[in-house]
Curated annotation (Swiss-Prot):
Protein name: FAD-dependent monooxygenase str9
Keyword Oxidoreductase listed: yes
Family: Belongs to the paxM FAD-dependent monooxygenase family.
Induction (UniProt): Induced in strobilurin-producing conditions (on CGC medium after 6 days of growth).
GO molecular function annotation: FAD binding; monooxygenase activity
EC number(s) from the headed UniProt entry: 1.-.-.-
GO BP annotations, alphabetical order: secondary metabolite biosynthetic process
Function of the protein: FAD-dependent monooxygenase; part of the gene cluster that mediates the biosynthesis of strobilurin A, an antifungal polyketide that contains a key beta-methoxyacrylate toxophore that targets the complex III of the mitochondrial electron transport chain. Strobilurin biosynthesis begins with construction of benzoyl CoA by step-wise elimination of ammonia from phenylalanine by the phenylalanine ammonia-lyase str11, oxygenation by str8 and retro-Claisen reaction to form benzoic acid, which is activated to its CoA thiolester benzoyl CoA by the dedicated CoA ligase str10.
């Protein structure tokens, strides 16, 4: 990377993925970074963040793990080489529930409040990284000349310039909209109308068929109704064949006197529909309390503790994207792949982040993975302002296959959690084994292998 011409990088989106990317990239003295956040303050939007083995390891590889470890008591710092029980699954749509399996994973599952996460990392941004709030991206202008800067436009009417744009701006990403509109226009001009239509269809997220009704419930109230409730021993998912599932787990708080309870209503016949705004809204809970009449007492007890009003979340997702890069613009995190549950926490998206303990391995996984690979590529000494587009092509080439796997695996596991396949649900032992197997890639696939693949391509093409 040429020292006499620094690469100006704009990171749009101040969620976990954007912050990690900015920190990792800013370690190079040959870049200048502007980090833009749409909200009035970093960490203002979103609940807690879940972190299993893979993102925890990536933070260590990036030299950032210690900042978060300082927030934890010594006995709660994850051990990367220890397998621990993480989530317990039960079939609960009957008078006496049945255990399905207990998911185990390396290092377990660590949670942080979003505000604590940002407070721990943001002070370590060096002087070559400037931060801005109340800057919501509207679009960017793709330059006709490779040497000209990218112009980005914000909702307040201001503009900025950069050499590289990193869109970490969530599932409703304006970066993705601009990128895929440019690609579609190009295909249209070349007479490829079907391709243009397909590209435009990838811009807007579609309904997954899952609505989540979320509530924070009192641990004291639940203990009075069910003193031996499974949720007090281990985060638990109660599953039912009526396409319903309910995770219940202690919420991240200073005194742990509350639990997060969520009721998932799954109708996969609606998968792929356009879901009207807003995706998140408050609704009355009275109908939910009577929605599990034949379920085991523990499940009914948890629902009975929900408040009068609950938050309804429509889980929307993206169809697989064929590329995460165009020109000198890349997509990161939910802007590139928004997976359905159960792999959808530690999200960079502001409107759609679910801090559910049932959602095991996604990074919570993907934004960190993306930031890790992108930073390793762009901080390679061979990358310059003149060849940075070729470097970004490598990022897309490496990340798309892995991200597509996560998307597909997430969908399969989400359906298993909803007992969607009645044949599979009839054999609980086999179902549990299948669900566990769908998750093991999250700690068996080493992120350093993906880094090696990326850097080998940099050496091959740019050196």
């Amino acid at each position: 990377m040429a020292v006499d011409r620094k690469i100006r990088i704009a990171v749009v989106g101040g969620g976990p993925g954007g912050v990690i990317a900015a920190l990792a990239l800013s370690k190079s003295p040959n870049v200048e970074i502007d980090l833009y956040e749409a909200a009035t303050a970093f960490g203002d939007i979103g609940l807690s963040l879940g972190m299993p083995w893979r993102p925890w390891r990536i933070l260590r590889l990036l030299g950032l793990q210690g900042y978060l470890a300082a927030l934890l008591p010594p006995d709660q710092i994850p051990k990367e080489d220890v397998t621990v029980p993480t989530i317990h699954y039960r079939k609960s749509d009957q008078a006496v529930g049945e255990d399905i399996f207990t998911c185990t994973s390396l290092s377990g599952y660590t949670r942080f409040r979003r505000s604590h996460f940002h407070a721990a990392l943001l002070p370590h941004l060096p002087s070559n990284c400037k931060t801005y709030t109340s800057k919501r991206l509207v679009s960017y202008a793709e330059p006709s000349n490779a040497s000209d800067p990218i112009v980005i436009t914000f909702a307040d009417g201001t503009t900025a310039e950069c050499d590289v744009l990193v869109g970490a701006d969530g599932i409703k990403s304006p970066t993705r909209a601009s990128m895929y509109n440019y690609a579609a226009d190009e295909a249209e001009k070349a007479g490829r109308s079907a391709e243009a239509n397909d590209l435009r269809s990838k811009i807007r997220a579609k309904f997954s068929g899952v609505e989540v009704y979320r509530s924070v419930i009192s641990a004291e109230q639940l203990r009075a109704a069910a003193p031996d409730h499974h949720a007090f021993r281990c985060p638990t998912q109660f599953l039912g064949k009526e396409k319903v599932r309910m995770p219940t787990y202690p919420i991240q708080s200073e005194n742990s006197q509350f639990l997060n309870c969520a009721l998932y209503i799954c109708d996969y016949s609606r998968e792929g529909e356009d879901y009207p705004e807003p995706w998140v809204t408050d609704v009355e809970a009275k109908d939910l309390r009577s929605s599990l009449p034949d379920w085991e007492p523990e499940a009914q007890a948890a629902v009975s503790c929900m408040g009068e009003v609950v938050s309804r979340w429509a889980i929307c997702t993206l169809s697989p994207l064929p590329f995460f890069q165009r020109s000198r613009v890349v997509l990161l995190g939910d802007a590139a792949v928004r997976v359905t549950t159960p792999f959808s926490t530690f999200s960079s998206d502001h409107c759609q982040t679910l801090a559910c303990y049932d959602e095991l391995p996604r990074c919570r996984l993907r934004p960190g993975d993306d930031a890790y690979i992108l930073s390793e590529i762009l901080t390679h000494p061979a990358v310059t302002r003149d060849n940075v587009q070729k470097a970004l092509e490598i990022y897309s080439e490496v990340r798309v296959p892995m991200s597509t796997h996560v998307l597909e695996s997430s969908r399969r596991t989400g359906m298993d959690c909803a007992l969607h396949d009645e044949v599979a649900a009839a054999d609980l032992k086999s179902l549990g084994e299948r669900m566990q197997q769908e998750m093991v890639w999250a700690w068996e696939w080493n992120p350093e292998d993906e880094k090696k693949k990326a850097l080998d391509l940099v050496e091959e093409r740019l050196v």
